[in-house]
A protein has these predicted regions:
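Sec-dependent signal peptide recognition
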Residues: 7-8, 17-25
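N-terminal signal peptide c-region/cleavage motif recognized by signal peptidases
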Residues: 32-33
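Cleavable N-terminal signal peptides
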Residues: 25-26, 36
Length: 292
């Protein structure tokens, strides 16, 4: 009888250990990230998320990045509020090359009149030429086309080219952007929006700026600051200067959040702004069956 009792006790202990091992394995499987490419998305700065000056790196090949409604709110010194919203999706279509589609939306106050609607269709291609070396920064080129789609869009299409450089040191990264936009000035003042929203909403003849950021890998977040100047499409307007700062945080292996604030230092739209956005990284294996 004693032997039987001991055997039952040993069987119970073995069963408990097996259940514990199974539960632990299941928990690890559930908690393990399924999309490794999204784990460092906080480290890659995109235009408008949360600053306009971006780095020279692109979305991984065969990976998608869904930018979930990056929002920018501006308040001018005159008390007018402007909203910018541009949902985007990017695809790493080739090695070191991404394509991106965005639909900028605008909510503006002009002369006491509120207007809202689609401000265009933004198509872009970005290519990263190289990884950084001891003597050469990472370099990239982006080409954009803003199509005249929507009731708040310009009356013609605009194309632009942007050169990007990124240099990394042990204590910080530095980025330099320079952009030029081709095309005549808009015929209507409403189309020549000076709303400095994410992406296509900030249409200017030229743009030049620099940014610095610092990453904290153990906490999965990054802080950044920028300063840039932009010349409006209207040649009669002076160059506008803006300073801003922000942060990006990796909430999960596939989801990153960002936020920032800053101030336009001069110009007719002088005032402050805040931004908030998120990005979800994922892949669709069925679309790329041969990818590894």
């Amino acid at each position: 009888m004693i032997t039987t009792t001991i055997r039952r006790m040993l069987s119970t202990v073995a069963l408990q250990r097996a259940m514990l091992s199974t539960s632990s394995a299941l928990a690890l499987a559930l908690l393990a990230p399924t999309e490794a490419h999204g784990q460092t998305d906080y480290y890659n700065t995109d235009r408008g998320r949360p600053v306009q000056v971006e780095d020279a790196y692109v979305t991984e090949r065969h990976a998608f990045e869904l930018k979930l409604a990056p929002v920018r709110l501006e308040r001018t010194n005159g008390g007018a509020y402007n909203w910018g919203l541009e949902p985007e999706i990017a695809l790493g279509i080739l090695p070191r090359t991404q394509v991106e589609l965005g639909v900028p939306l605008a909510f503006m106050e002009q002369g006491g009149v509120r207007r809202s609607g689609i401000a265009g269709l933004d198509l872009s291609v970005m290519h990263n030429f190289n990884v950084e070396t001891e003597g050469l920064p990472a370099l990239a080129l982006r080409a954009d086309v803003l199509a005249p789609v929507g009731n708040l869009a310009a009356d013609r299409a605009y194309s632009s080219l942007t050169g990007i450089a990124t240099r990394t040191y042990s204590w910080a990264r530095f980025h330099v952007n320079g952009q030029y936009t081709f095309g005549a000035s808009p015929a209507s003042s409403s189309a020549a929006t000076t709303l400095g929203g994410p992406g296509a909403l900030d249409v200017s003849r030229w743009f030049a700026g620099a940014a610095i950021d610092k990453a904290y890998p153990l906490s999965s977040y990054l802080v950044t600051a920028e300063f840039y100047g932009r010349k409006p499409l209207d040649s009669s307007q002076a160059v506008e200067y803006t300073a801003g700062t922000g942060t990006r945080f990796q909430l999960s292996p596939t989801l990153a959040l960002d936020g920032g604030f800053g101030r336009r230092l001069n110009g007719p739209e002088q005032g402050w702004y805040v931004t908030f956005g998120s990005a979800y990284a994922f892949s669709i294996p069925a679309l790329f069956p041969g990818a590894r």
